[in-house]
Amino acid sequence: MMLRAVFRRASIRGSSSASGLGKSLQSSRVAVSAQFHSVSATETLVPRGNHAHSFHHRSCPGCPDCSRTIINGYQGTALQRWVRPFSSDSGDVVEAVVPHMGESITDGTLAAFLKKPGDRVEADEAIAQIETDKVTIDIASPASGVIQEFLVKEGDTVEPGNKVARISTSADAVSHVAPSEKAPEKPAPKPSPPAEKPKVESTKVAEKPKAPSPPPPPPSKQSAKEPQLPPKDRERRVPMTRLRKRVATRLKDSQNTFALLTTFNEVDMTNLMKLRSQYKDAFLEKHGVKLGLMSGFIKAAVSALQHQPVVNAVIDGDDIIYRDYVDISIAVGTSKGLVVPVIRDADKMNFADIEKTINGLAKKATEGTISIDEMAGGSFTVSNGGVYGSLISTPIINPPQSAILGMHSIVQRPMVVGGSVVPRPMMYVALTYDHRLIDGREAVYFLRRIKDVVEDPQRLLLDI
């Protein structure tokens, strides 16, 4: 009522100044006080330029003067000074959103929250993780502040741009999250005592003689006992992760699409292991990375792909796409599943470049920080099951590739060398290929080239 009176008086007088408005406010409040015989104080605005300098409490006529300053230096428009003089700013609130996750990824599952409501976070600090078909992506806080609330739940499907959390960035931000309080359980009402049935005096009835009971039936034949199923409380049902779903779908598609066939060979690892043992210290000192066996097989695979380019090709509809580059994927097992990062232009790399690239990609894959771009593409895959102790296996093709090489564990076996039986470090290698595109002859030649280069690495120097 006071505010409407102020604006009504100001509009009638045609005055828009702060001082005129202040007088209107004072006169209207005095009138109200006189009507209700109130002794409450009135507010008077003392303008100074474009700032409200102070408010004073003054008593009504006949009361002693008593004044004190309420606020100093309040700045704003005339409407703000009169409409919201005592409101407090609750602070800025920013919202954390789902980032862009790659060209081929449209959504993901919110896997876990890394913070709780009420926790303080810094700018760019991870507050949640999104699991996609390929990688795990962090959601970062856009600014420093305190998490007020989360707008989604774990397990929800989210898309780029969806809001995930509200974060207060005010200086005195505090958590407004109260501990969950359980509603007091009301005691269950006590059951009322059953109503007593009226007693009825029964008259004695003459008892009839009982009929003779029939003879008991013969015992039935016992059927075979059904097998006891394990109790349900000893089983756990866990939803599949998006990565596991994606792997399952791709492997089944590979099995349904390709004419899978696997051929095997065995490789004598003596010379490659001798080369590694002889130069590993000098290699580490110069390049800052250890010399492993994987780089030797990558170089051998590059040479074999150059000798048999059809293994590096792929069927696309009614066409065959021949790739004039060699991008080799390496299978890396992680706690969350299998990922396959790519070594780009492996045909242009030396041993040191390959080892550095493998170590960097494997570290990112293990830590879950590998990007979508680092796993896209690839023309051929090398999988090393030997690090887990696998003796032999039949790997499955990684679409849209046409072949995959499987390495296995190195085992000392008796071999005939120069007419004598000697122990040799041997490895089985397997090539699974799409028989629609690759004939058995090309597959055998490919594996034979792998065997020749690994058993005699000097071939790489002479290009023979």
From Swiss-Prot:
Residue range covered by the transit peptide: 1-86
Free-text remark on how the cofactor is bound: Binds 1 lipoyl cofactor covalently.
Ranges annotated as biased composition (Pro residues): 211-220
Segments of this protein annotated with the region Disordered: 168-242
Compositional bias ranges of the Basic and acidic residues kind: 196-210
Pathway: Amino-acid degradation; L-lysine degradation via saccharopine pathway; glutaryl-CoA from L-lysine: step 6/6
Enzyme class: transferase
Subcellular location: Mitochondrion
Cofactor: (R)-lipoate
Domain Lipoyl-binding: 93-168
Sites of N6-lipoyllysine modification: 134
Active site location: 435, 439
Principal location class: mitochondrion
The protein, known as: Dihydrolipoyllysine-residue succinyltransferase component of 2-oxoglutarate dehydrogenase complex 1, mitochondrial
Family statement: Belongs to the 2-oxoacid dehydrogenase family.
PROSITE patterns: BIOTINYL_LIPOYL, LIPOYL
